[in-house]
Amino acid sequence: MSGLQKQEALVQEFKDLLKQEQFGSQGEIVDALKANGFDNISQSKISRMLSKFGAVRTRNARQEMVYCLPAELGVPTAQSPLKQLVLEIEHNEVMIIIQTSPGAAQLIARLLDSLSKSDGVLGTIAGDDTIFIAPSDVSKINETIKKLEQLFSKNLT
């Protein structure tokens, strides 16, 4: 098994364990992963994975504090209702700004971050209702705007 395959298997096992909603500490997650054949796991690695995947501690059905994944863990798609939340797309010579409905910016930014750099998006910063987009090539910012408008089926500019 290659390094990438091992990493993918680890991530899948990690997510499967958290879906069980029975692990109250990072140490318990480490022990469960080791029991499932992932020997090179440390508490600090689990801490980074919990942060990366947005895991939170919450009460399960037995009222125990456990780690779990947020319901929206999957990457949203442009076919989902999210595209209806984009209100306006604006830009200057170096940056693109998307205005969204209140509370929708981080979900839309997550979709944009899943695009490849060839789609024109280097990265995003999202607040509550505003997304700052750094284009991968400012000389092609108009092409990136067109791709974003197509993605969200809007002609806003």
Swiss-Prot record:
InterPro entries: Arg_repress, Arg_repress_C, Arg_repress_C_sf, Arg_repress_DNA-bd, WH-like_DNA-bd_sf, WH_DNA-bd_sf
Pathway where this protein functions: Amino-acid biosynthesis; L-arginine biosynthesis [regulation]
An example Gene Ontology molecular-function term: DNA-binding transcription factor activity
Location of the protein in the cell: Cytoplasm
GO biological process: L-arginine biosynthetic process; protein complex oligomerization; regulation of arginine biosynthetic process
UniProt GO cellular component terms: cytoplasm
Record's keyword annotation contains Transcription: yes
Keyword list, A-Z: Amino-acid biosynthesis, Arginine biosynthesis, Cytoplasm, DNA-binding, Repressor, Transcription, Transcription regulation
Domain of life: Bacteria
Classification via Pfam families: Arg_repressor, Arg_repressor_C
Main location: cytoplasm
Role played: Regulates arginine biosynthesis genes.
PANTHER family registered for this protein in UniProt: ARGININE REPRESSOR
Annotated family: Belongs to the ArgR family.
Name the UniProt record assigns to this protein: Arginine repressor
Gene name linked to the record: argR
